[in-house]
């Protein structure tokens, strides 16, 4: 029996509001972060991810007081990302009540930071977030590249190789977002999800593109993901967490109901 699979609603926070964009650009308001997080906690989400989406690109620190406010209302694991660049940033987030931190852009510029963070705080709280885009042409072997700064800057790094390297350096989890799928509601990029899930021995969280509950099922069964992350299908009331868990259970996936 494997570990139960997880459903993780994601709060993309911009200037103190939960927002949801399409391919990281076109933004729509989804409410107050503390209220939204509280609702998911009550609905039975397994974890919550809070991403300060302006932090890295605008070089702004993640809002510590908001993390404190969410942590005081939420009793499931909370991952916080956005603008995490130093061990001091990590310490502040963990002290504010985060259980894990997501490192994205900073890992690309300074991979040693991941090693240092894992040694200091433990791999269990270090999540490396990977934003990948498919770069292979039709008919070529599949290849995905890492992008930074909210999907705007290509790095030349191969996504699968990078994931393996980050796990070697101490990442305890990989949060994989397909930039091609983000906000499209067409489902996860199952190719890159499966490639990375099969390449590393730590949990992989699939993100980017969920439009219905069957996409969550596909992420686990076909994509081999350990957890599935979604935003807009939950934020705007199309589906509840319980409906999602029921659909996944019906498909034979072990869930915490």
From Swiss-Prot:
Keywords: Amino-acid biosynthesis, Cytoplasm, Histidine biosynthesis, Lyase
Single GO MF descriptor: lyase activity
Active-site residue list: 12, 131
Domain of life: Bacteria
Disulfide bonds: none
Presence of the UniProt keyword ATP-binding in the record: no
Family per similarity comment: Belongs to the HisA/HisF family.
Subunit composition and interactions: Heterodimer of HisH and HisF.
Protein name as it appears in the record: Imidazole glycerol phosphate synthase subunit HisF
The organism of origin for this protein: Marinomonas sp. (strain MWYL1)
Originating gene: hisF
């Amino acid at each position: 029996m494997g570990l139960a699979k997880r459903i993780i609603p994601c709060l993309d926070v911009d200037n103190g509001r939960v927002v949801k964009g399409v391919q990281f650009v076109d933004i729509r308001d989804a409410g107050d972060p503390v209220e939204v997080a509280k609702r998911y906690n009550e609905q039975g989400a397994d974890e919550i991810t809070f991403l300060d989406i302006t932090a890295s690109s605008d070089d702004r620190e993640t809002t510590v007081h908001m993390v404190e406010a969410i942590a005081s209302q939420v009793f499931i694991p909370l991952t916080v990302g956005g603008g995490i660049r130093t061990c001091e940033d990590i310490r502040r987030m963990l002290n504010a009540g985060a259980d894990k931190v997501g490192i994205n852009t900073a890992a690309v510029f300074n991979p040693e930071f991941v090693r240092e963070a894992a040694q200091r705080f433990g791999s269990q709280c270090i999540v490396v977030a990977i934003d990948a885009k498919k770069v292979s042409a039709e008919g070529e072997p599949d290849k995905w590249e890492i992008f930074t700064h909210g999907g705007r800057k290509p790095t030349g790094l191969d996504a699968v190789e990078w994931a393996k390297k980050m796990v070697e350096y101490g990442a305890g989890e990989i949060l994989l977002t397909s930039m091609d799928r983000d906000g499209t509601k067409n489902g996860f990029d199952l190719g890159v999800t499966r490639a990375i899930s099969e390449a590393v021995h730590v949990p992989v969280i699939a993100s980017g593109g969920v439009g219905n509950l069957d996409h969550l099922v596909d992420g686990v069964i076909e994509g081999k993901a350990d957890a599935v992350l979604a935003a807009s299908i939950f934020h705007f009331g199309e589906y509840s967490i319980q409906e999602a868990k029921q659909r996944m259970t019906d498909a034979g996936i072990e869930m915490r109901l």
